[in-house]
Amino acid sequence: MSKRDYYEVLGVARGASDEELKKAYRRCAMKHHPDRNPGDAAAEAAFKECKEAYEVLSDGNKRRAYDAHGHAAFEHGMGGGGGGPGSPDMGDIFGDIFGNIFGGGAAGPRAARRGADVGYVLELDLEEAVAGIERRIEIPTLIECVSCHGSGSEDGKVQTCGTCHGRGQVRIQRGIFAMQQSCPHCDGRGTLIQNPCKTCHGAGRVEENKVLSIKVPAGVDTGDRIRLAGEGEAGPAGTPPGDLYVEVRVREHAIFQRDGDDLHCEVPIRISQAALGDTVRVATLGGEAEIRIPAETQTGKLFRLRGKGVRSVRSRSEGDLYCRVVVETPVNLTADQRELLQQFEATFTGEDARKHSPKSATFIDGVKGFWDRMTS
């Protein structure tokens, strides 16, 4: 019996794109999959025909050979007995197309799990976070066993698992669907170790403290994460390692509070400075700066110093420094100072008090009005 044209099998034109081929194969395979047609020999044969056609047409070299010579291109050396050219494994093609629907993705040792990711909290002072720093850290982790180079075998020899036949996964029937899961016999490796390594006892990994140097970019803030690819735990049986995620945590500062790329601080000034005005020096992360306090400044007034905040780790623009003035009440007064203040206070009488302390007068008037309403 002659074979059907592969394009006809998938129902596509000869100029079909790779994406069109994949969609056509998906439709064909879904329709004829044995799990949907249990005991149907015709459906099983059609399913194999779909796989065979897709294996050829999805491979550029095979497709060119087929377009030039038809089925004759595979009559010598590519047969492979009843399964068509190359006899594709369902895990190679069908699993790649359908993911978890029928096979859980690409099967076998190729899909073996990677090493676990590792987290580390790095505490920094505000100055370190703003300027950037290189810091050495030590983390407990699993590294590849140097004795067996991660194989877990003392002599380097491994045996193919008889349960999963080296694929690392086994099929589990769930109604009309067949699911795949990690082989419980070989733990998903696809191989078994007859002579375990004496150092790692067959695990291929050993516990050890790893010392790393981390370059922290300038401008990081609490919650930012730095990813170091491949610096997590070593993968089992030589699979790729996980990643290391360093989470930044910035300690509280004695002077500054951070809000994004802006900084805030309080600047205490004396009553005389607030009343008469003055120029005061304030601390910034880059040194000192001056702010001019105008006469009659009240507590809470904000002064903005542009560009004196934090340089953004993302945009590289600079934030600002906001200085909030706090008028400080004098303490530990001498007798002379107390007398001077008493003389000063004596000048606040009548309308002069309302003129020189308008907020106090407004507050007193408000309290008086409240009690008048309560007692009326």
Swiss-Prot record:
CXXCXGXG motif repeats lie at residues 145-152, 161-168, 183-190, 197-204. One of its GO terms (cellular component) is cytoplasm. The keyword Cell inner membrane does not apply. Transmembrane segments: none annotated. GO terms for biological process: chaperone cofactor-dependent protein refolding; DNA replication; protein refolding; response to heat. CDD domains: DnaJ (cd06257), DnaJ_C (cd10747), DnaJ_zf (cd10719). It is found in: Cytoplasm. Its main location: cytoplasm. A zinc finger (CR-type) spans 132-209. Disulfide bonds: none annotated. GO terms for molecular function: ATP binding; heat shock protein binding; unfolded protein binding; zinc ion binding. InterPro entries: DnaJ (IPR012724), DnaJ_C (IPR002939), DnaJ_domain (IPR001623), HSP40/DnaJ_pept-bd (IPR008971), HSP_DnaJ_Cys-rich_dom (IPR001305), HSP_DnaJ_Cys-rich_dom_sf (IPR036410), J_dom_sf (IPR036869). Zn(2+) 2 binds at C161, C164, C183, C186. Residues 5-70 form the J domain. Zn(2+) 1 binds at C145, C148, C197, C200. Its cofactor is Zn(2+). The keyword ATP-binding does not apply. Binds 2 Zn(2+) ions per monomer. The J domain is necessary and sufficient to stimulate DnaK ATPase activity. Zinc center 1 plays an important role in the autonomous, DnaK-independent chaperone activity of DnaJ. Zinc center 2 is essential for interaction with DnaK and for DnaJ activity. Participates actively in the response to hyperosmotic and heat shock by preventing the aggregation of stress-denatured proteins and by disaggregating proteins, also in an autonomous, DnaK-independent fashion. Unfolded proteins bind initially to DnaJ; upon interaction with the DnaJ-bound protein, DnaK hydrolyzes its bound ATP, resulting in the formation of a stable complex. GrpE releases ADP from DnaK; ATP binding to DnaK triggers the release of the substrate protein, thus completing the reaction cycle. Homodimer. Belongs to the DnaJ family. This is Chaperone protein DnaJ. It comes from Xanthomonas oryzae pv. oryzae (strain KACC10331 / KXO85). The lineage of its organism: Bacteria, Pseudomonadati, Pseudomonadota, Gammaproteobacteria, Lysobacterales.
